[in-house]
From Swiss-Prot:
Gene3D superfamilies in the cross-refs: 3.30.70.60
Gene: rpsF
Protein name per the record: Small ribosomal subunit protein bS6
A GO biological-process term: translation
Superkingdom of the organism of origin: Bacteria
Keywords for this protein: Ribonucleoprotein, Ribosomal protein, RNA-binding, rRNA-binding
GO cellular component: cytoplasm; ribonucleoprotein complex; ribosome
Alphabetical list of InterPro entries matching this protein: Ribosomal_bS6, Ribosomal_bS6_CS, Ribosomal_bS6_sf, Ribosomal_S6_plastid/chlpt, Transl_elong_EF1B/ribsomal_bS6
Similarity section: Belongs to the bacterial ribosomal protein bS6 family.
Species in which this protein is naturally found: Listeria welshimeri serovar 6b (strain ATCC 35897 / DSM 20650 / CCUG 15529 / CIP 8149 / NCTC 11857 / SLCC 5334 / V8)
Family matches, as HAMAP family: Ribosomal_bS6
One term of GO molecular function: small ribosomal subunit rRNA binding
NCBIfam families: S6
Length: 97
């Protein structure tokens, strides 16, 4: 049975527009390649952070809603987001059925 997840991640603010699109496409691709079905992937815009992260005071928020049967896609996203220089913070939420 597919579970619903929501992923929110913050992209560094000093990124070029085309690079930002490439980051979003790359991470959406990671999810779909590992068996997830993306329901919605939307940009939330540039927002001020509640506190400074890696010397950044703001960042580009992006939200992805998806269905996944197994946690493989979520685990791979989590692993790669942790080592990516473009993503300063991310959070995965499993939605209630």
């Amino acid at each position: 049975m597919a579970r619903k997840y929501e992923i929110m991640y913050i992209i560094r603010p000093n990124i070029e527009e085309d690079e930002k699109k490439a980051v979003v496409e790359r991470f959406d691709g990671i999810l779909t390649e590992n068996g997830a079905e993306i329901i919605e992937s939307k940009e939330w815009g540039k927002r001020r952070l509640a506190y400074e992260i890696n010397d950044y005071r703001d960042g580009f928020y992006h939200i992805v809603k998806l269905n996944a049967d197994k946690a493989d896609s979520i685990n791979e996203f989590d692993r790669l987001a942790k080592i990516s220089d473009d993503i300063v913070r991310h959070m995965v939420i499993k939605e209630e059925a």
